[in-house]
């Protein structure tokens, strides 16, 4: 990692220095949350031992980075989520690896084919070499192929090989962020655990007839597995809209549908709740929202969040992210709290589906998961 005060204190795991830094940020307005998150990225991209089995920390950081970049969080909320990110990073295990752009001595005629051949042999070094060539020559094709590999092997890891890395590509690789090459190396290191054939063909995994009720199916059920059904489907839809996505590139929906939705039913209780009148008063301030947020009343609080979203998307982004961050407890925090609500909100904000009830169900599902899981 390149030298900076934040990076150095993270490398030293200096909790005292981190506390001093956060205190200073609380008194000074002249700081950029996006820049501070960027300083953390090399470490977050190479988390080791994977506390939650996958790269949730960098995903959560990039979701929050995007919201901050788009001015959707207040300054108070920015500081609160930074406190959470720094505290979590200090608690995690990660390795100090950083990659960068290089001038290539030899080039393959087709670097993507060469990369797949090396992955088939579990030769990470060579796979990364050809991935760098592809990133220089055809970055959009590289990103589609990497995500397709993640999607195909997603059922083996609850979809994390797609959902954890989509924001990495969207926010880091596609924008040619200084951490882009490190991000590509991290993704290849993750994919290298799977038996990827040298003749891998995206066309073998496409499905062009996803059912109209896919969102309602994905947003049904409780618990972490069912939440991931929604997370993965929304990630697919964001991928379809991504700047780097070639509209002719087939997405591996067949694997997702067969493994996740084919034998699943729609939650009648959740569908009924989102179709009923909200009948909840929208708070006028964050303090009132905090008081109205009832951790023991799922029916009330899911309606509260949906009512807040309908009243003001800006307030919903800001207040929910702040409340979740304020609820942070070291050792018990689950990054899926942010992942679930972020993707449910973004599904609605970008109108990724015409299914109004399905979109409401996604918010309901994410909030219910939080209420059932948070240690409060």
What name fits each language-model region?
Residues 1-376:
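Mature, well-folded catalytic/scaffold domains that follow N-terminal targeting or propeptide regions
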């Amino acid at each position: 990692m390149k030298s900076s005060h934040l990076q150095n204190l993270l490398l030293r795991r200096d909790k005292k220095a981190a506390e001093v830094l956060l205190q200073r940020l609380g008194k000074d307005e002249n700081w950029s949350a996006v820049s501070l998150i960027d300083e953390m990225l090399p470490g977050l991209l190479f988390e080791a031992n994977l506390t939650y089995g996958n790269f949730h920390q960098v995903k959560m950081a990039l979701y929050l980075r995007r919201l901050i970049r788009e001015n959707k969080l207040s300054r108070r909320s920015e500081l609160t989520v930074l406190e959470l990110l720094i505290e979590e990073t200090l608690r995690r295990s990660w390795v100090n690896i950083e990659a960068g752009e290089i001038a290539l001595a030899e080039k393959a005629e087709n670097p993507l084919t060469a990369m797949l051949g090396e992955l088939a042999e579990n030769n990470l070094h060579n796979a990364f070499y050809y991935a760098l060539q592809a990133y220089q020559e055809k970055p959009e094709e590289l990103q589609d192929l990497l995500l397709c590999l993640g999607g195909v092997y997603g059922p083996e890891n609850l979809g994390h090989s797609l959902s954890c890395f989509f924001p990495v590509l969207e926010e880091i690789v596609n924008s040619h962020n200084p951490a882009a090459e490190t991000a590509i190396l991290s993704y290849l290191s993750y994919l290298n655990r799977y038996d990827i054939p040298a003749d891998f063909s995206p066309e073998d995994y496409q499905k062009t007839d996803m059912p109209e009720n896919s969102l309602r199916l994905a947003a049904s059920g409780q618990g972490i597995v069912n939440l991931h059904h929604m997370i993965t489907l929304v990630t697919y839809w964001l991928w379809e809209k991504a700047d780097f996505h070639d509209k002719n590139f087939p997405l591996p929906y067949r694997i997702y549908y067969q493994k996740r939705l084919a034998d699943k039913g729609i939650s009648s209780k959740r569908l009924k709740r989102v179709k009923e009148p909200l009948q909840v008063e929208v708070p006028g301030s964050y303090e009132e929202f905090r008081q109205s947020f009832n951790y023991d009343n799922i029916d009330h609080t899911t309606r509260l969040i949906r009512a807040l979203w309908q009243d003001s998307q800006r307030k919903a982004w800001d207040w929910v992210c702040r409340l979740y961050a304020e609820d942070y407890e070291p050792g018990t925090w689950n990054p899926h709290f942010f992942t679930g609500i972020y993707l449910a909100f973004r599904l609605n904000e970008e109108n990724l589906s015409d299914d109004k009830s399905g979109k409401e169900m996604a918010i309901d599902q994410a909030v219910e998961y939080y209420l059932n899981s948070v240690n409060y």
